[in-house]
């Protein structure tokens, strides 16, 4: 990785009443908690963007169930936009943390400046490309003749706000990685609350239906984007957006490190596409019903995976900063507490998912059709059987990414996705469309075992090499 010129120590003037997390000196248990909880809550609130849309859409008179399936078909395109934001945000944020740990403010500033330009460029390209290809993509992603009009209507309006979505998601990582996880949470909450207020107004009061849901989402993302820009231009963060230090090597480093989270989300996209295609092709007369049920199941999984990614991603700055400083002891202790937090959260969500009452209440938010509700609750029970092992996968793989150890994190991520795709294709062919829902728990168990083995055998050696590079000795 390119060596940037060392700068002055990164300091914060206490002009603002905002809690500052000192990544290199605060006690690890409290530090992990202060970073993980706001990031987890922020991601949980972020889930409301899609869940609130789908909840209101599912309750539109007469057409709610089909319209809900249409919005679900749009999921891969929405996720693709998020993937590009994550490519830059999750690629640049760990590098900024590492440079801050090295007390290299000039290098950190150059990283943020280049990432800002990359985010804007990607947003423009995505908007143009998605508009040109949206109809073909929606059909390819599984839209039937009845579902397509609702999917196309939602997508046509949603794409107008691509730049807001990319900037709000990508820039938020640079707020969190500087120790201001509370402000990162506020950025997400602003958009979510606005979305909650605007959805019923546009959908029901103004009778805009699916169009109203898309308009509400665009306006909400614009509000989150504006807040993130304010914080990174004029807020209390030590490293702000500047318009200097542009460098192709910096962009290369960001894109290389961010490739892991980008491909992870992109492969999640492939999983959703495979799910929809298999349900459409092997669901027979029930294909529309199965697609609607799957949309609700995936919405439920978002309330697990998004907060879980908040825990593992929000604490990457602790690992990145101390990796930059060469403090192996703090890295080990931090990873231990991150894993404990992730396991606790997933255990709670497992109980919630397996309890008929709680799962039934969730499904009831989307549909009042008894047949849809019964089938969806059953699929939620199946899909979440291995939620607890999923915590191991997220905590360890994201931890490796936070320390810039892409050589280990990328293969582990691909391994889980590959198993899932193979099972999602094989199970419906062999046992029928509903069997596809077993692909998730089976792949989660296998991936968690393999990831744990790789982590405990490979990571200690990589950390020793890092300490040797910095001229330090391992503290036993």
Give the location of each predicted region:
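Residue-level hotspots within pore-lining transmembrane alpha-helices
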Residues: 41, 45, 49, 81-85, ...
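Transmembrane helical elements of multi-pass membrane transporters/channels
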Residues: 34-53, 157, 191, 220-224, ...
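N-terminal transmembrane alpha-helices
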Residues: 23-63, 76-91, 95, 120-127, ...
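Short runs within selected transmembrane alpha-helices of multi-pass transporters and secretion channels
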Residues: 89, 158-176, 187-192, 213-228, ...
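Transmembrane alpha-helix boundary and packing residues in multipass membrane permease domains
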Residues: 39, 43, 55, 94, ...
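Helix-terminus/linker motif at the lipid-water interface of multi-pass membrane proteins
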Residues: 44, 48-69, 138-145, 201-208, ...
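Small-residue-rich hydrophobic transmembrane alpha-helices
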Residues: 68-128, 165-184, 291-355, 390-412
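Short alpha-helical transmembrane segments in multi-pass integral membrane proteins
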Residues: 1-38, 96-161, 207-259, 319-386, ...
